[in-house]
Amino acid sequence: MSSFGDFIALSDICDTDTARLIKREVSDGVIAPGYTDEALELLKQKKKGAYNIIQIDPSYQPAPIERKQVYGITFEQGRNELDINGDLLSNIVTVNKEIPESALIDMKIALITLKYTQSNSVCYVKDGQAIGIGAGQQSRIHCTRLAGSKADNWFLRQSPQVLGLQFVDSLGRANRDNAIDVYMGDEYMDVLADGTWEGIFKVKPPVFTREEKRAWLDQMQDVTLGSDAFFPFSDNI
């Protein structure tokens, strides 16, 4: 979620538990095929009643031809209706033919994510969720780097150094998230400098060193890498 808001899209009916999670997030709106009565009442309270709640028809079928106009010129192409299923992954070209079921699930999630992400696009998936997406870049290796840095940050947020941060009670969730992002990056002194950290942390944390980050990242395994087209050069890998 963006610190300044985002739209949330759900593929199933929004229930009460999901609505409670959404209610505390900075968000501009939600779209779903339906809402339970209690969930709808919770979401109506968000943004003093100005929160966008959209219901989509789950039976809607888009037109087979997509059209876009650019300065009076109409471009059209067939809609991407590729059915992503296990058959797409049946041709295993590596020496090792044994792929765990969990990896096959992550591969399908990667393909679904990339199907609806602006090209060029690359994503990393782990344990059933996309942990890093790089999209809309002219160079595929730039997509890989962008997605990889997001995946690294996702895992670094689970490190003992980050989980042990003690924030001042008055700091909001969005500001905490931003402080964590800066703390993990190269500009960490922006939150650790004297006169600054006191407004963020109860106790000044030590620098999260490059060596410590590398050691933690080396523990990450079972990550799936996906691309919306072939990798033209081995440097992406």
Can you annotate each of these PLM segments?
Residues M1-I237:
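ATP-dependent carboxylate/acyl-activation modules
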